[in-house]
């Protein structure tokens, strides 16, 4: 996708966001992790879970027994090594900042096409909003119900890193 976020948007205004980077997968992918839509920091970096306080990469590295990946190529390699695909439920939406609870005007990604091109048998959503959106817009078409994982977002700081690691172990 080549859509852009409105440059005139302020922190509290509703912005049309179009997913700007592709799903990460290959034909050997067996597990699919789905977020909702990339955060402003992720869109800046051009890759998933780019906010420095988001605990996604730290949690995944611990679950997979890997060194914490620091670069985008290292992150991609870690996921591919463990047959994990990564994408977001939404192709586009309107949103206020990074607040998943403000998401409206949704256009879902074609997740069924990714699943058909892979060996994905299990789908996990990285947060309640991603799970709700997947179940509402995608589950029937895909034919796989998703399991809900706790969000690794800094907004979900009440959940400790230890609890996140424990919850994410089910992807193995």
Regions found by a protein language model. Give the residues of each.
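C-terminal capping/extension of enzyme domains
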Residues: 1-30, 52, 97-112, 135-172
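Short, hydrophobic/glycine-enriched beta-strand segments
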Residues: 30-36
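Hydrophobic/aromatic beta-strand patches that form the interior of the parallel beta-sheet core
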Residues: 32, 85-87, 124, 147
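Short loop/turn segments at strand-loop or loop-helix junctions that form parts
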Residues: 36, 89-91, 151
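Short, surface-exposed acidic-centric catalytic microdomains
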Residues: 41-102
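Generic beta-strand or strand-like secondary-structure segments
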Residues: 59, 85, 110-114, 133
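Proline-aspartate-enriched helix->loop->beta-strand connector
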Residues: 111-124
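Alpha-helix capping/helix-boundary segments
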Residues: 129-131
């Amino acid at each position: 996708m080549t859509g852009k976020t409105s440059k005139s948007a302020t922190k509290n205004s509703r912005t049309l966001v179009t997913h700007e980077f592709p799903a990460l997968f290959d034909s050997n992918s067996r597990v699919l992790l789905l977020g909702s839509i990339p955060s402003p920091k992720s869109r800046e970096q051009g890759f998933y879970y780019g906010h420095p306080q988001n605990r996604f990469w730290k949690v995944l590295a611990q679950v997979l027994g890997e060194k914490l990946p620091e670069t985008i190529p290292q992150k991609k390699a870690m996921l591919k090594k463990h047959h994990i695909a990564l994408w977001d439920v939404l192709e586009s939406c309107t949103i206020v900042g990074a607040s998943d609870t403000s998401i409206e005007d949704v256009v879902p990604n074609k997740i069924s096409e990714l699943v058909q091109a892979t060996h994905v048998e299990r789908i996990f959503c990285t947060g309640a909003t991603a799970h709700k959106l997947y179940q509402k817009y995608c589950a029937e078409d895909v034919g796989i119900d998703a399991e809900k994982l706790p969000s690794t977002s800094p907004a979900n700081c009440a959940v400790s890193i230890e609890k996140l690691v424990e919850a994410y172990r089910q992807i193995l």
